[in-house]
């Protein structure tokens, strides 16, 4: 229950989801289960309905998601419990539905500078250019997804499994 200001990050996430139209939340819990359940209870004081998918051991991101399968029967949002978001989830859900994809990922364009000069050379070792501490850009996963229930079929039950593996399997199926 990592705090951010006066509230746990999880409470900020639930508030953000509610403001974006989410009415029902399933929290996938494991080792911090008791403190999370005691704090959030059924979710009514947070303006949502909360249910709990429980595992007795850590299962990694997708493995934990698999524990919520019995609660999911339509398009759903999966968010990591240790991040804060400031974008329109409503727009993301609309885009997901228009695209007819099985998974829509939120991405962030991360820019960073290399600490070193980058040297380009020919095969013979002759220097052709020098770029001092160049800036690079890469799209990174920020742990918020809109998914279709069939994605859960790609996740093995009761086994640690990463979301990266689910995304790779989805890409292989071209969905």
Language model features by range: what are they?
Residues 1, 118-121, 167:
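A structural signal for short hydrophobic beta-strand segments in well-ordered beta-sheet cores
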Residues 76-77, 84, 90-97, 111-113, ...:
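Catalytic-core segments of class I nucleotidyltransferases/pyrophosphorylases
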């Amino acid at each position: 229950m990592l705090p951010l200001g006066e509230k746990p990050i999880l409470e900020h996430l639930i508030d953000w989801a509610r403001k974006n139209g989410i009415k029902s939340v399933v929290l996938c819990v494991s080792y911090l289960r008791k403190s999370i359940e005691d704090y959030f209870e059924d979710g009514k004081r947070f303006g949502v309905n909360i249910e709990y998918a429980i595992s007795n051991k850590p299962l990694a991101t997708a493995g934990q998601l698999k524990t919520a399968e019995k609660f999911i029967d339509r398009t759903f949002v999966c968010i990591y419990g240790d991040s804060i978001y400031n974008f329109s989830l409503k727009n993301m859900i609309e885009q997901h539905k228009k695209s007819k994809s099985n998974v829509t990922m939120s991405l962030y364009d991360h820019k960073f500078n290399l600490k070193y000069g980058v040297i380009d050379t020919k095969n013979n070792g002759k220097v052709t250019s020098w770029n001092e501490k160049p800036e690079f850009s890469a799209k990174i996963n920020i742990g918020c997804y809109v998914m279709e229930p069939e994605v859960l079929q790609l996740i093995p039950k009761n086994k640690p499994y990463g979301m990266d593996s689910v995304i790779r399997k989805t890409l292989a199926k071209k969905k």
